[in-house]
Amino acid sequence: MAVRWTWAGKSCLLLALLTLAYILVEFSVSTLYASPGAGGARELGPRRLPDLDTREEDLSQPLYIKPPADSHALGEWGRASKLQLNEGELKQQEELIERYAINIYLSDRISLHRHIEDKRMYECKAKKFHYRSLPTTSVIIAFYNEAWSTLLRTIHSVLETSPAVLLKEIILVDDLSDRIYLKAQLETYISNLERVRLIRTNKREGLVRARLIGATFATGDVLTFLDCHCECNTGWLEPLLERISRDETAIVCPVIDTIDWNTFEFYMQTGEPMIGGFDWRLTFQWHSVPKHERDRRTSRIDPIRSPTMAGGLFAVSKKYFQYLGTYDTGMEVWGGENLELSFRVWQCGGKLEIHPCSHVGHVFPKRAPYARPNFLQNTARAAEVWMDEYKEHFYNRNPPARKEAYGDLSERKLLRERLKCKSFDWYLKNVFSNLHVPEDRPGWHGAIRSMGISSECLDYNAPDNNPTGANLSLFGCHGQGGNQFFEYTSNKEIRFNSVTELCAEVPQQKDYVGMQNCPKDGLPVPVNIIWHFKEDGTIFHPHTRLCLSAYRTAEGRPSVHMKTCDALDKNQLWRFEK
């Protein structure tokens, strides 16, 4: 018996040593205390659990204190900055913009600890919190080839604005970056920062799986996900954690303030924030708060219910996130995961909110810094699992999505069944009732091809931030939906509703076709947006008594205008096709 015990003891000892070796290798960059002045910040020192006699206001202190503000420094208080550059410096700046889609040349010259003016509502500033009763959080920041200064400014911003008693850790997840400065240089830098851990993936995982890797190592009660080019404002964390402490089924987002990619000006929203929505291509959109939600809230600082979230910045109870099925790991890189999670939380008994007292700035790059080749695959997965029969509206506007190999969905569908989730019809009626649901009547939606110039289809391409700022035109038929998808409704409207609900109109005394916002459901239809799409293929506008006609400009470019109807003119014939 003694011999058996000795061998068992040896086996246990060997197993313990192997486990210890694994942990040492796995956490090659461990959490260390910061030396005084690390990264330019003043350390408060290692913090103990608060004593019972510690005052509540003292519990609000962050782990690190920002250096004193320098009103003359670039970007201080969130001001816009512009450098006077010579030809060589300007070339360097443009090269960095091309690489990162952000003005990193300027970012590198702005303090990592800059101060941001606190423009929160008075009620937010006056709000008191019971810190001892709030849950702790792990802040998870996944990154891939992020610029040095924007990544470090994000880290310092969290450390310098989050109460030390609430911030369990910052977990950085490096998704196989290949930039040299993100190797040993980053490890050395964060080894001087308290409560910051670095995890590196062994292969490119994409945002969804990289975040999940971070979540598996998190020890906080709440998971707070941030993008890697953010700046947190004063008091950003407490409202999120307090809301979750009161309702664990709430996923709560901060108000996302804009940091200009070129000047680094911090635009803080001071009024009512926008809420999330989507169009029928399953692209995220911002919307104003509807009246029924304003009426439901009793205070300006009450959380605002949102049908969807942007996805980059949110907090969720770790237990609830696991119960809800975390992320769909079948999604690649990024894109679509935000809508999938939004549909899931609402349909499965939770809620999604934006807290008006929590503000985090986000640098919106000039363009996406890397491609999203799997966006349609991701959105198709969301549509197949959560949208029921309404997924046809998505496919109609994204014909290539029907051919996407979106992978095995059996586990996600079982999850929906196990959680006893509601239908998408319920979601539209109870959560996003303001969204117009297309009719998509058979034979009356899709691309509208000209019979006179048969290679061309009606096309609408509005400028950014001005949905009605263009005219209807012709462009080569591409079969991709999008800007060539139209719907002829039972109200006799020609709707362009892939992005925004727009209706074709003929402005008074004009011969071109513009676009205006469609009337809300149930309201009268203006006469200038009523069309008769006849069986013979003509598109007649009763108010002007004219017909839509294709033609070529003097330069030979195909276009459309309104013209006297002529039954023999083939340029006035059109047909819908999928």
Curated annotation (Swiss-Prot):
Q: Where is the Ricin B-type lectin domain?
A: 444-577
Give the comment on domains: There are two conserved domains in the glycosyltransferase region: the N-terminal domain (domain A, also called GT1 motif), which is probably involved in manganese coordination and substrate binding and the C-terminal domain (domain B, also called Gal/GalNAc-T motif), which is probably involved in catalytic reaction and UDP-Gal binding. The ricin B-type lectin domain directs the glycopeptide specificity. It is required in the glycopeptide specificity of enzyme activity but not for activity with naked peptide substrates, suggesting that it triggers the catalytic domain to act on GalNAc-glycopeptide substrates.
Q: Which GO terms describe its biological process?
A: protein O-linked glycosylation via serine; protein O-linked glycosylation via threonine
The answer to whether keyword Glycoprotein applies is yes
SUPFAM superfamilies per UniProt: Nucleotide-diphospho-sugar transferases (SSF53448), Ricin B-like lectins (SSF50370)
Spell out the CDD domains in the cross-references.
pp-GalNAc-T
**What keywords are assigned to this protein?**
Disulfide bond, Glycoprotein, Glycosyltransferase, Golgi apparatus, Lectin, Manganese, Membrane, Metal-binding, Signal-anchor, Transferase, Transmembrane, Transmembrane helix
As for what it does, the entry says: Catalyzes the initial reaction in O-linked oligosaccharide biosynthesis, the transfer of an N-acetyl-D-galactosamine residue to a serine or threonine residue on the protein receptor. Has a highest activity toward EA2 peptide substrate and a much lower activity with EPO-T, Muc2, Muc1a, Muc1b.
Annotated residues for binding of substrate: D175, R204, W334, Y370
Site positions for Interaction with glycopeptide substrate: D459, H478, N483
- State which residues carry a glycan (glycosylated): N471
This entry carries the following GO cellular component terms, namely: Golgi membrane; perinuclear region of cytoplasm
Please list the reactions this protein catalyses. Answer: L-seryl-[protein] + UDP-N-acetyl-alpha-D-galactosamine = a 3-O-[N-acetyl-alpha-D-galactosaminyl]-L-seryl-[protein] + UDP + H(+); L-threonyl-[protein] + UDP-N-acetyl-alpha-D-galactosamine = a 3-O-[N-acetyl-alpha-D-galactosaminyl]-L-threonyl-[protein] + UDP + H(+)
Q: Which residues lie on this side of the membrane: Lumenal?
A: 36-578
- Give the cofactors, semicolon-separated: Mn(2+)
User: What does the record say about its membrane topology?
Assistant: Single-pass type II membrane protein
What's its EC? 2.4.1.41
What is stated as this protein's family in its record? Answer: Belongs to the glycosyltransferase 2 family. GalNAc-T subfamily.
Q: Which residues lie on this side of the membrane: Cytoplasmic?
A: 1-12
Positions of the UniProt region annotated as Catalytic subdomain A = 134-243
Where does the chain cross the membrane?
13-35
Q: In which tissues is it expressed?
A: Highly expressed in sublingual gland, stomach, colon, small intestine and cervix. Expressed at intermediate levels in kidney, ovary, lung and uterus. Weakly expressed in spleen, liver, heart and brain. Not expressed in submandibular and parotid glands, skeletal muscle and testis.
The protein in question is named: Polypeptide N-acetylgalactosaminyltransferase 4
Annotated disulfide bonds: C124-C357, C348-C421, C457-C477, C503-C518, C547-C565
GO MF term set = carbohydrate binding; manganese ion binding; polypeptide N-acetylgalactosaminyltransferase activity
Q: Where in the cell is it found?
A: Golgi apparatus membrane
